[in-house]
Amino acid sequence: MSVCIKDQIQNMNIVIGCTVGCTYCYARNNVKRWHMIEDFSDPEFFPGKLKMMEKKRPKNFLLTGMSDLSGWKPEWRDEVFAKIRENPQHQFLFLTKRPDLLDFDTNLENAWFGVTVTRKAELWRIDALRKNVRAKHYHVTFEPLFDDPGTVDLSGINWIVVGTMTGAQSRKIHTEPEWAWSLADQAHKLGIPVFMKEDLVPIIGDENMIQEMPEDFNKVLEVQKSWKK
């Protein structure tokens, strides 16, 4: 039985808003529906949420579920990174579609930096991530997968996630199973874990799903099981 990635990784929306402007953006629709901020194209920082990181029960957190790291002001990033360093019990993920706008170094052991790739024409983002974000851990999310990305240079990448379009737009987009299998095969040849998101079940088949997490994430999940809530 496949698992939902949201059960493994919790959103912590420290920044809300994004300047990228994707036409299929679920975050923009949610912000508009729930009136989270006035203007989604003008990101806002909510430093009060940093206290969530102080909880001792380990968790895996995605910090860019409602934003893009490229839209964070440097001072926001510095404050968040400092808090991450103080809380090694957690693992933290960041995503961006504009790695070309980033340029920084970090030696954080529990921070994972990734790019979203939806089509072959966006493979440059992986190279830009490795060049512009000098970090310990990298990941790539191939979602929603609009076409066959072909041969991908995954050197230095520590995890990949593969998914398709969800919601109302899913009827307009068809992800071929061969695209997902090709990515999984390429990653496995390099020893990279692969996580197929639950929306691929109708395409791949539940019995064929690959749902692997990095060992650091698995350790967090194991400790969670033994932790008294």
PLM feature segments, named:
Residues E86-F92, R134-H137, A184-V194:
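Structural alpha-beta junctions
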Residues M1-D7, F146, T151-K229:
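Auxiliary Fe-S-binding modules of radical SAM enzymes
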Residues M1-W112, K120-R134, P149-L154:
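Conserved Radical SAM active-site core
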Residues F61-L63, F92-F94, F113-V115, Y138-F142, ...:
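Hydrophobic faces of well-ordered beta-strands that scaffold small-molecule active sites
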Residues E79-A82, L129-H137, H174-Q186:
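Long, well-ordered alpha-helical scaffolding segments within enzyme catalytic domains
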Residues T118, E122, I173-E176:
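Short capping loops/turns at secondary-structure boundaries
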Residues S67, R98-D100, V117-R119, P144-F146, ...:
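Active-site-proximal loop/turn and secondary-structure-junction residues that shape catalytic pockets
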